[in-house]
Each structure stands twice: as C-alpha cells, then as structure tokens.
Design a protein with these regions (language model features):
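Short, charged/polar micro-motifs that form catalytic or ligand-binding hotspots
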Residues: 14-17, 42-45, 97-104, 142
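Non-transmembrane, interaction-prone segments in cytosolic or luminal domains
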Residues: 56, 87, 111, 147-151
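C-terminal, charged low-complexity interaction regions
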Residues: 135-162
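N-terminal cysteine/histidine-rich coordination modules
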Residues: 1-74
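Extended interfacial segments that mediate partner engagement and assembly in macromolecular machines
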Residues: 65-132, 141
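Residue-identity detector for glycine
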Residues: 27, 36, 52-56, 75, ...
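Amphipathic alpha-helical interaction surfaces
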Residues: 58-61, 120, 124, 149
Length: 162
C-alpha cells in the first residue's frame, strides 16, 4: 500500500457504479447489478439488470423514478452515497458495521479505492482546485482519521473476504 494518494480527490462515486454486488431479494445471497457502461452525466439506458447466480433471480430495470420536486431539474433520480444500489435500491453485499457506522462499497474496485485512500498517510489535494464532490472529499471523518486507520483497513480486508 502506498503512503501517498494523489487521485482520490479526482474520483467520483458514480465511477464505481458498475457491476454492483448486492444482496439477492429472493435468497439473501450475493447477486450482481449489471449496469453496462454507466455514465452519470448522460441519459440513462434501461439495460440495467440484477442477476443472482444462486437462485436464478433476475430483473431488468423498467423505469427510474422521475423527480417529484418541481424545483429540481427534469431528469431521473438515482440515490447514491448510501449502502444500497442506486437502481433497484437493494442492500449492497459489501457492508459491515464499524463502531456504530456502516462501512460499505459497491464492488471490489470501490473497496480497493477505499483501502488506498484510508491507508495513505499523505493525501494530496494540491494538484487542482478542491473537488468537493469527489469521494476523497466526501468520506466521513471516522473513516479517514489517522487513529482509526488500521482498524478501518482491517475491516476493509474482512469485507474483501466476504
């Protein structure tokens, strides 16, 4: 693990919204939400599917809820930043309790990113203006605190083996 992190303030959560590991609503085992090539800035294609290899459950996304508040711009609503997938709102598979908080990730790539950011002793922001919407800027203090670094990394490794 590197002691230095430069790219974590240029990465956004929507970049990990692909092949999300979730809990199957039918058998409670691991299922996967296939999102295809997802780009949060483009029109959503309706080829998103959830598939469970254990029980055969599968469902294709029919429609994404339109925004209800008239003050919001027109478009579709995807809830991100919570331990649920943004399409079917199923609980993510990679989640665990950590000191009263929830440590979670959409997939193994997201988990690797969290391990890299948390494990870095130096997190550089000076390569460009602050990116307040990036994951590095949005992670909670309990996760990035130096005194909890080893415990968080241990919890991440435990999730990796799930």
């Amino acid at each position: 693990m590197e002691n230095r992190s430069k790219q974590t303030y240029h990465t956004h959560l929507y970049q990990f919204v692909k092949d999300i590991l979730v809990e199957c609503p039918q058998c409670a085992k691991q299922a996967i939400v296939h999102t295809g090539v997802f780009d949060a800035l483009k029109k959503i294609e309706y080829n998103v599917r959830v598939v469970c290899a254990a029980c055969g459950y599968n469902k294709t996304l029919e429609k994404i809820s339109p925004r209800q508040d008239p003050k919001q711009k027109r478009g579709n609503v995807l809830v991100m930043g919570v331990p649920r997938d943004p399409f079917f709102y199923l609980p993510v598979w990679l989640q665990a309790d950590f000191s009263g908080e929830t440590l979670w990730a959409y997939n193994l790539e997201h988990l690797d990113f969290l391990a890299q950011h948390v494990g870095a002793k130096l997190r550089e922001r000076n390569t460009s203006p602050r990116m307040n919407r990036s994951i590095g800027a949005r992670l909670p203090r309990w996760m990035t605190a130096a005194d909890k670094r080893e415990a968080v990394l241990k919890a991440i490794e435990k999730l990796r083996g799930k």
